[in-house]
């Protein structure tokens, strides 16, 4: 397996991994302890990704070499992630419990990978929840309280949860009126809920609604769709830091 294929071609995942973590870090007090935790978080994601690809390909591929290509990256990333995780947890044992909370969601993602249904709506939502939960973890590590992190974590969940149906309307389900209507309806509700969390979030979530309503069907290239989501993710990070 070439080195370039060690990193998954899932650009949206990186924003989902980074934005809640960075929001939690800067809503609290950034510390050196955040660095090994961030490394453990990203390496853990890479390890799980390759493990799930091995699981999927072991079942569906007729080429025995296909699943084997993911074994080495899974072990390398997993070992490195575990090392950084233990480094983080040694002075903060509660991080082990926080990590365990992600287990049910990883199990759901693994079941969908085994069934070769990774593009399922529920599978996407199951991936979003622990990613947004990292805001709580990073905030607590920086001296903040769990309670202070609930509203900003919900804001992240509202946005990244909405990207699951929205991106489908731009690519795989671009011809589905049902997905389009569902995505727009979700974003309408998200604007209201976000505004209830804090009025500061009304403007960015109104923009997210407009992009969900206006961009599908315009034939945008995948790269453009990704660039728009990067900008939206950065806007979310800025809004959360200002609002909370």
Locate the predicted segments by residue.
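Interhelical loop and helix-boundary elements at the membrane-water interface
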Residues: 1-14, 60-70, 109-129, 170-184, ...
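C-terminal transmembrane-bundle signature of multipass membrane proteins
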Residues: 190-244
């Amino acid at each position: 397996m070439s080195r370039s294929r060690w990193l998954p071609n899932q650009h949206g995942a990186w924003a989902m991994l980074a934005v809640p973590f960075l929001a939690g870090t800067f809503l609290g007090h950034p510390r050196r302890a955040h660095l090994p935790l961030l490394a453990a978080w990203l390496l853990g994601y890479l390890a799980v990704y390759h493990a799930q690809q091995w699981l999927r390909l072991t079942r569906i591929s007729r080429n025995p070499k296909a699943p084997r290509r993911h074994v080495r990256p899974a072990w390398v990333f997993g070992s490195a992630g575990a090392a950084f995780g233990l480094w983080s947890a040694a002075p903060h044992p509660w991080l082990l419990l926080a990590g365990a909370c992600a287990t049910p969601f990883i199990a759901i993602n693994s079941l969908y990978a085994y069934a070769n249904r990774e593009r399922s709506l529920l599978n996407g939502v199951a991936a979003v929840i622990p990613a947004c939960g990292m805001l709580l973890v990073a905030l607590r590590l920086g001296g903040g309280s769990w309670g202070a992190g609930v509203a900003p974590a919900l804001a992240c969940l509202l946005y990244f949860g909405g990207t699951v149906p929205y991106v489908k309307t731009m690519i795989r389900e671009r011809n589905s009126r049902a997905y389009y209507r569902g995505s727009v309806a979700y974003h309408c509700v998200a604007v209201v809920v976000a505004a209830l969390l804090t009025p500061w979030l009304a403007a960015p979530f109104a923009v997210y609604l407009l992009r969900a309503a206006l961009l599908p069907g315009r034939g945008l290239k995948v790269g453009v769709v990704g660039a728009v989501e990067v900008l939206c993710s950065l806007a979310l990070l800025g809004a959360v830091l200002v609002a909370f």
